[in-house]
Amino acid sequence: MSVPVRYSSAAAEYAAEVDCELESTLQQQQQLHLQQQYEQYQHYQYQREQDIAYYCQLQAARQQEQLMQQRTSMSSSVMPGLALPQDHQDHPAALLNGPHNNNIGLAMDAHSINAILVDDEQPSTSAQAAAAAAASAGGSAGAGSGSGLGGAIGGGKLANGINRNAEMPTDWMRIADEGRYGTPGAAGLEYQKYEQQQQLEDLAESEAGAVGGASNNNGESSSSLKKLEDQLHALTSDELYETLKEYDVLQDKFHTVLLLPKESRREVTAGGRDGSAYVLRCLKMWYELPSDVLFSAMSLVDRFLDRMAVKPKHMACMSVASFHLAIKQLDLKPIPAEDLVTISQCGCTAGDLERMAGVIANKLGVQMGHAPITSVSYLRIYYALFRNLAKEIGGDFFKFYQQLIKLEELENRLEILMCDVKTTVITPSTLALVLICLHLDFHIKESYTRGSPELKHVFEYILFLQQYMRIPDRVFTCGFSIVSGILSHYNGQNKAPYKQRLVWKLSSRTLRVLRPINRFSSDLPTIEEGIPNALDDGLRSRTESISSEEEEDWPTSPIIPIFEQC
C-alpha cells in the first residue's frame, strides 16, 4: 500500500523541523555549558585574587605585630585574627569565605592593637596631676612659685600629649621612621644590636687576655674625674657659654616633673622612688662608677615613671634595669646582669632585667653612646666658669677656690639632692646653679668678711648667670628653698659610713634540706663577775653592730622596706 504524496511530504517537513529544534536545543545546551564553565573560571580567578590579597594583608599584619613586639620588647602571643589557617588551600569553603574572614580578622586586629596602645600609652597619675597643675596655673595668676613651675612644665606635657588618636598604620610608619632618630619605635632593634656588639667585644677582650670585671671600673673612676677636670680647665669661658646653650636646648628632653603620691597601693609613691634612688647610689658606690651613671639612670627612672603606669611591685626591676641600661648608654664596662640582680636583691632574674632594659630603651628612645643632659652636666660647666672667674680675680681668692671648692664634693651633694623627688620640679640648670651658689656661700662665710671686694664680683657673676640661663627670680628662690631644706636635713643627721647588710633569702625547700650544725658558730668565753673585761672593744667581730640595729635614714636592705611593701 502506497502512502499519499501529501502525507509523505508533511512527515518529511515535520521530521526536518524536529531535527532543527533538536539541533538548536543541543547548541543552546552547549552554549549554556560553556557559559557556566566561563563563569566558574572567572569565579575561580576572583577567589584566587581575593586569597592573594588576603595573604598579603596577613603578612602586613604580621609585620605590624612584629613592630609592636619590638616597640614593647615583650613576647606576646600571635592574635587569633592574624593566624593563617592551615587548611587554607585544602578546603574550598575556606576560599569562598576568605573575604568575610578577612574583614573579621582585620576588625579583631584593629581592636586588639587599639587596646594595647591605649594600655601602653595610658598616662600615669603623676602625668594627670601635672596636667591639672598646668590648668590651675593657667587659671590663677597669683599661684606660688613652686606650683607655677610645675604647672608650666606639666602644661607642656599636656600640649605634647594632643593628637594621640592618629591613624594606626600612619602611626606605625611614623614610629618606624623616627625610631632611628631617638624617638620610641626602633630603639629596641638598636638595643639588640648594641647587645650583640657588646658580646662580641667582650669575647674579643677575653680572648686577648684583658682583665675584666669591676677592677677596670675601679681603676678608671679616679682617673676619669681627673681627666674631666683637666678638660674643663682647658676650655675658655666662651666655649663654656656655647656648651651651656647646647645643653639648654636639650635639657627638656631628659627632664620631667614627677608628682607622686605619698601613699598609694596602685602607684609608685614618692618614698618608693627615693628609696630606689638610694639603692642605685649604693650600687654606684659599690662598683665605683662615675656620677654620670647614677644621674642617667635616675633620668630614665623618672621619665619612665612619668610616661608609664608602673606598679609598685615592678619598681625594683625597673630601677635596676635603668641602672644597667645607663652603664651601656655611657659606653662603660658592662656589669653582668646576674651580678646586679644578686647585689641589688631586686627579686627578679637576669632575663627579666634584660627584657625590662629593652622595654625602657624602646619606650624612651634611648640612643647608645649618647650621654643625656642632666644636672651634673650643668654643674661641671658652672664649676669651670667660676674657676675662670676666680682665676681672673686672682690673689687669695683663686687659692681659696682651688682648696675648698671641689668638684667631687659638689657631685656628691648633687647626688643627695637627686635622691629626693622634690628636686624634679626644678630644671637641671637651675638645680646646679643653686647648689654651687649655696656651696660658695657656705665657704665664703667662713673665709671672708662681708665687705670683701672679691665678693662683689662673685655676686654680680651669679646674677649674670641667672639672666644668661633665663631663670626667673621666683623660680630661683623656690629652688633655693628646696635645696637648702634638703641639705639642712641631710647635714643635721648623724653621718654614718655607707653600709648595706646582705640578706640571704632561702626558700622553704632549702630550709628543709639544711641541717643545724655547730661548725659555723664559735663559743665565747664566759665573763666572770668582778674581773675586768680582757677583751678590747676594738676586737669585736661586728663593726658598728649597735648602729646597724637602729633605724637609719634609708633601709639596710633595699628590697624589704622598699619593694616588698606592695
UniProtKB/Swiss-Prot annotation:
UniProt record, GO biological process: cell division; double-strand break repair; epithelium development; female meiotic nuclear division; G1/S transition of mitotic cell cycle; meiotic DNA repair synthesis; negative regulation of G1/S transition of mitotic cell cycle; negative regulation of Notch signaling pathway
Residue ranges of domain Cyclin N-terminal in the record: 285-368
Annotated localization: Chromosome
Pfam families assigned: Cyclin_N
Keywords attached to this entry: Cell cycle, Cell division, Chromosome, Cyclin, Developmental protein, DNA damage, DNA repair, DNA-binding, Growth regulation, Meiosis, Transcription, Transcription regulation
UniProt GO cellular component terms: cyclin-dependent protein kinase holoenzyme complex; cytoplasm; nucleus; polytene chromosome
UniProt GO molecular function: cyclin-dependent protein serine/threonine kinase regulator activity; DNA binding; protein phosphatase inhibitor activity
InterPro entries per record: Cyclin, Cyclin-like_dom, Cyclin-like_sf, Cyclin_N
Loss of function: phenotype: Viable but females are sterile and produce eggs with a ventralized phenotype where the dorsal respiratory appendages are fused. Reduced levels of grk protein in the oocyte cytoplasm and very low levels in follicle cells and in the extracellular space separating the oocyte from the follicular epithelium but no effect on grk transcription. Increased incidence of DNA double-strand breaks in mutant germaria.
Quaternary context: Interacts with corto. Interacts with the cyclin-dependent kinases Cdk2 and Cdk4. Interacts with Brca2 and Rad9. Interacts with polycomb protein Asx. Interacts with protein phosphatase 2A subunit wdb.
Listed PANTHER family: CYCLINS
Recorded family membership: Belongs to the cyclin family. Cyclin G subfamily.
Role played: Cyclin with roles in multiple processes including transcription, meiotic recombination repair, cell cycle regulation, and promotion of normal growth and metabolism. Binds to the promoter region of the homeobox gene Abd-B and is involved in maintaining Abd-B expression in the pupal epithelium. Involved in the transcriptional repression of the homeotic genes Scr and Ubx.
Protein name according to UniProt: Cyclin G
Organism: Drosophila melanogaster
Taxonomic lineage of the native organism: Eukaryota, Metazoa, Ecdysozoa, Arthropoda, Hexapoda
